């Protein structure tokens, strides 16, 4: 499996309209051609920044999607339409850890959450696989005790992003009060204190951000949105800066 990580900056007042248009005009064509939406999120701290995370079977699928976007008239029309909504866009290709759940597994399990925790670790060159293995063996079971589930663990493919990027995404509760309790449990856990010391040898820097699952057609989303949901059911919430240290 491969994953496509699209960071999209949207005109703030048009964000919900963009979600609707993307769901009707872009998503069906992509999924028909093998690019499956795993999650569409609003990102804190910049609230008009969105993350679209896609799952693909292999590099051949990615090549086919690229050719489709370059040549297909419908995709050309979408690109012209998207200019009205998007002010910036960056993408990168991710490779999953062996234990990272696939979309099929996520759909079968209980991974819906209003809040997800996104961590971006800057790992020393050549240590990405070693760090991800430690996440799977040590941090994943630890976090589950606190009430978090791993949604994905990925490393960025060289040439598509800064070197040494490892991204983890976790469920983090349905209200901010639940996150506060999760964080409190982690800070009292001696195993987590040990992990932070140990993890420092792999990653000198890690950035934490909240993701908000507020898009009705996203497989990863708040359980308070039923499927299918009307566009007016999508609503923003107050979002503080994430802190976990």
Regions found by a protein language model. Give the residues of each.
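Charged, often glycine-rich, active-site loop that binds/positions anionic groups
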Residues: 51-55, 166
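Extreme N-terminal starter segment of soluble prokaryotic enzymes
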Residues: 1-5
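An amphipathic, aromatic/His-enriched active-site/gating alpha helix that lines ligand/cofactor pockets
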Residues: 17-42, 46, 55-94, 137-151, ...
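Surface-exposed interaction/gating patches
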Residues: 7-12, 98-177, 218-221, 229-245
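Short secondary-structure boundary/hinge segments and terminal tails
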Residues: 47-49, 160-161
